[in-house]
Curated annotation (Swiss-Prot):
Protein name: CD83 antigen
Described purpose of this protein according to its UniProt entry: Transmembrane glycoprotein predominantly found on the surface of many immune cells including dendritic cells or lymphocytes that plays various roles in immune response regulation. Plays an essential role in CD4(+) T-selection, differentiation and stability by regulating the activity of the major E3 ubiquitin ligase responsible for controlling MHCII trafficking MARCHF8. Also inhibits MARCHF1 association with MHCII or CD86 to prevent their ubiquitination and subsequent degradation. In addition, acts as an important modulator of protective responses against acute infections.
Keyword Disulfide bond (UniProt): yes
Signal peptide coordinates: 1-19
Cellular compartment(s): Membrane
Region (Disordered), start-end ranges: 60-81
Pfam families, per the entry: V-set
Positions in the Cytoplasmic compartment: 167-205
Amino acid sequence: MSRGLQLLLLSCAYSLAPATPEVKVACSEDVDLPCTAPWDPQVPYTVSWVKLLEGGEERMETPQEDHLRGQHYHQKGQNGSFDAPNERPYSLKIRNTTSCNSGTYRCTLQDPDGQRNLSGKVILRVTGCPAQRKEETFKKYRAEIVLLLALVIFYLTLIIFTCKFARLQSIFPDFSKAGMERAFLPVTSPNKHLGLVTPHKTELV
């Protein structure tokens, strides 16, 4: 098979691949993330959820035991509560969502023998959080804020320099005036006294 044909088949497969489903939820509300992995209702899978982070790292969210055996799992998380409810098998319920919960999640189903793993991804978008609004506002006015800070620093530096210069001007003129007065004083030698010089009289014989 030629390389061009391989690239064509890969592009076709990529275009036909199903897009990752996306779930949107308002801030502070609960959300139920479905596991998009294909599964057999007759097989009691064990499910695990991970959140995909930047750099390829993964963080375990809520490990879940067999749903089909009627087990229920609940965990308190830092950014909310995570449930593994029985209403929707293998789903992940996140309570009290925040902006930190936004991201891509992946569920993995493992059969009892541990020989086959099925996985699926879902994207969660949490909107309307106060922290998110502040971040968007900062990004919108970031250039103006940076310019304002630069102007404030410039004027503070100018004021400090002016105050220091005025202080130096108020101190040093006294020394310069005294130096000028000393420069114009007459210099006299302590060993020599000034007096009238009288010529000696000579008598003619």
